[in-house]
Amino acid sequence: ALENLATDNSQGEQYLTDVLGILRSQGHSVTAVVTTEENILGVNDRRQLAAAGAALRSRICDEWMLAGVTMVDPTTVWIDRTVELDAEVTILPNVTISGASKIRNGANIGPDCSLHDTVVDHCATVIRTTSIGAIIGEGANVGPYTYLRPGTVLGAGAKAGGFVEMKNANLGPNSKVPHLSYVGDATIGEGTNIGAATVFVNYDGQEKHHTQVGSYVRIGSDTMLVAPLVIGDGAYTAAGSVITEDVPAGSMAVGRARQRN
């Protein structure tokens, strides 16, 4: 019947209600079905579209809560049909989860998060974060005001803290980027600490370059790591340094002028 709908009316639109007449003309029986108003909402303008979207949002949230997901304020949570949530996930207010995102049990999301195509492993915490195409490992801690871009992987127990942006970067288990840093095109080993205001300088104006930082490294605050670069295991960089050459394992690199008073 749907393929026989015409537009010969004053609005020039296809009317779904015309299906009843078409079915009867084809010899089919037509009977009444009792349903809710929500199931037969019409969408003719943006206001009605928003109402239909809100009804679907509420239905999806109800289904997940019945499956064991905790939502502190479900009226502020938006979850795509394509999202996978385990039981025992906790979602705080003002959270949007979309695309192929997967949230594993024990994870805490929110408040104020937007996650798209993001995997959050068991018992991880994500606060006030925008994440696109990232993988957040078990027990990892993200936020607040963190931006995870495609290709970002956080290992188990890793931390990406306040005002941190990461792109195409692999942060090893128990490594930390606590605050105010940009990490782009990088691989970082386990147990490494990236000091505040560190920048991975990955772009030379034409191409992006990779930085490799080993395990148990200490990057001093306000360090500029100019890629391509390799920093060995257990190395240190002094605060305020501009590092342009590889740093051997266990070494201390200082790339700044001496203070003069």
What function would you assign to each model-found segment?
Residues 1-57:
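Catalytic-core segments of class I nucleotidyltransferases/pyrophosphorylases
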Residues 15, 48, 84, 230, ...:
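Residue-level recognition of oxygen-bearing side chains
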Residues 26-28, 37, 86, 189, ...:
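Short coil/turn connectors at secondary-structure junctions
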Residues 53-82:
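Long, charged amphipathic helices and adjacent flexible linkers at domain junctions
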Residues 77-118, 122-123, 129:
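Phosphate-binding active sites in nucleotide-utilizing proteins
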Residues 117-261:
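Glycine-rich hexapeptide-repeat left-handed beta-helix
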